[in-house]
């Protein structure tokens, strides 16, 4: 019997949490993500693993996580290629205070049914600026941090909280006294093809 791959173990745990999302559109998005996680993986050309200075906050983030998710993340993390990006009008320190690592989709570790997924890490005191995008998005919050969505107020869902962003809605997130770590899932359009 072969050992369970770290990516499969983490995504199994994350998928189970996302499937438990609240009723309504959030639950529908969570169930779609879970269905796509079950699609047979297709290999891709994996990026070389890479850590950035902001990754020093991962230990603190893992201490905030549920123990089984923390252990699964710690097993997967050495395979990840952490990257940063510049965003116009971002707050000072943003470039050094955040990173993301793609898990599924282009530049990820593999492909599954058109689902694009990755981790976001935001250092304490740093805000990931307001933005929007066409794909519907659902987050599984792994550590602390706060979230905002157009028409709402900043809130802290806490570890294992679910955050849902309908297509095109403005949203942002920020580290508080602790770093924010979450896995996000960008859902393909319903008319999109399954890979």
Write out the residue ranges for each language-model feature:
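Intrinsically disordered, low-complexity terminal regions of plant proteins
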Residues: 2-6
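Conserved strand-loop elements at the edges of beta-sheets that form or border functional pockets
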Residues: 121, 132, 140, 159, ...
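Ligand-binding loop in jelly-roll beta-barrel domains
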Residues: 168-190
